[in-house]
Design a protein with these regions (language model features):
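Walker A/P-loop phosphate-binding motif and the immediately C-terminal alpha-helix
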Residues: 1-22, 29, 171-172
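Patatin-like phospholipase
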Residues: 23-35, 40-167, 177-414
Length: 414
């Protein structure tokens, strides 16, 4: 309660197993407070049923060495508003013996995200989430232009803006995963340089049958840097998106092997082979949703910041005017240079669609122009990072009134 109060939120709470108040009495309490916390044990008591009916959001708290009851008494039949709007979070308390039961809990309660409590900073994050003062960050796809996201994260960290929930599509998912792993700015930049800047991650070309590259370089680098990390065990709540081209829908990856989810999210059709998951064929998230602000604003109650680097794509039109044949291209450029078809496929996958159902915008929209950086300009790291930093720093200054109370409370020793 003390941590929530730091965010200037008028909150009250009801303890476990008390007699449910009359509806009119409870309405008065809700109208008089910003946040009303209802604490309950999972049982079949009248109080627990009251909580299920009235809660707008569920925070199911569990120890990592515990098992959920099956079936868990939190189903669509309960008619709970939180279930309707998918606002069910798992708060995993890392106490007791180690176990791998987080995914089991997520399945039991159909959790949208996991809030892991590893240390005191995680408790502060939970306080921001409960008070509606948390900050979520959405990172778009954009190939090498997504390096700008690294500069955006740097600007937010320097300003003291906490990142409490993060997601991304395509290359934006990779940068988001770096943040969710809890890596420092220096560590993140070192790893991105090694994985994508030092040598072309899409350089293992083959004669195209399924794709223009084998995908082996990308898979090796994802395994080297992310190992066997599971999404549900990350320091920050995280998800990324891929596109299921069997049924044309978005796949939300919020649990399971992180590197597998990232491999699906960056599988540009025709460039990287797709990822097969049971009866699904998963390709780059950018194909269906390159900027998943709509998903984030559904799951998140707080301030959402979106960084979109795909608004102003750069592509060399002259490369497609009277293009040479295959052998003429090889004679002029050798086997190491990427042919124009790669730029064409990448741009086709990440081009913004103009439609009536565009994703809901973030509260703060940041669009680094990233001038002169093409989607496959993997060597243009410094230029893209600098532009992302500069644009985000300016956006923070412009939106200081909205950010200052959160930054001030987050930086205060509670």
């Amino acid at each position: 309660a003390r941590r929530i109060a730091a965010y200037k939120v008028n909150a009250t709470w009801f303890s476990c197993n008390q007699e449910p108040p009359e509806t009119s009495e409870f309405d008065l309490v809700e109208n008089a407070h910003d946040v009303v916390l209802l604490a309950a044990r999972v049982d079949h008591s009248p109080w627990y049923r009251f909580v299920l009916r009235h809660a707008d959001r569920f925070l199911v708290m569990a120890r990592r060495d515990s098992r959920p009851s099956k079936p868990f008494p939190l189903t669509a039949d309960d008619g709970a508003r939180a279930r309707k709007f998918r606002l069910v979070d798992l708060v995993m308390l890392h106490e007791g013996a180690h176990s791998g039961r987080t995914a089991e809990w997520m399945d039991a309660i159909d959790a949208a995200r996991v809030i892991n409590i590893y240390n005191d900073a995680c408790v502060d994050r939970l306080a921001r989430i409960i008070s509606g003062k948390s900050i979520a960050l959405v990172l778009s796809g954009g190939g090498a232009r997504a390096y700008a996201h690294i500069g955006a994260v740097k600007a937010m960290r320097e300003a003291g803006a906490p990142i409490d929930f993060i997601c991304g599509a395509s290359m934006g998912a990779v940068v988001a995963a770096c943040v969710a792993m809890g890596w420092s700015q220096e560590d993140m930049e070192t790893r991105i340089r090694e994985a994508f800047v030092a040598s072309n991650p899409l350089g293992d070309h083959v004669l195209p049958v399924v794709a223009l590259t084998r995908g082996g370089r990308v898979e090796d680098r994802l395994e080297r840097h992310f190992g066997d990390a599971l999404i549900e065990n990350l320091s920050l709540p995280f998800f990324c998106v891929s596109s299921d081209i069997v049924n044309g829908t978005v796949r939300i990856h919020n649990r399971g092997m992180l590197r597998t989810a990232l491999r699906a999210s960056i599988a540009l059709p025709g460039i990287l082979p797709p990822v097969i998951d049971d009866h699904a064929l998963l390709v780059d998230g950018a194909v269906v949703n390159n900027f998943p602000t709509d998903i984030m604003t559904t799951l998140h109650r707080g301030l959402t910041i979106g960084v979109d680097v795909a608004r102003e794509g750069v592509i060399d039109i002259e490369a497609f005017r009277n293009p040479p044949g295959f052998f003429s291209w090889i004679a002029s450029h050798g086997f190491t240079a990427a042919p124009p078809i790669i730029s064409l496929l990448m741009r086709s996958a990440t081009a913004r669609r103009v439609s009536l159902d565009m994703p809901r915008p973030a509260d703060i929209m940041i669009a680094p122009p990233v001038p002169g950086v093409e989607l496959r300009d993997w060597k243009m790291y410094e230029t893209a990072v600098a532009d992302g930093y500069k644009t985000t720093k300016a956006a923070i200054d412009e939106n200081w009134a909205a950010l200052a109370p959160i930054i001030s409370a987050a930086g205060r020793k509670l």
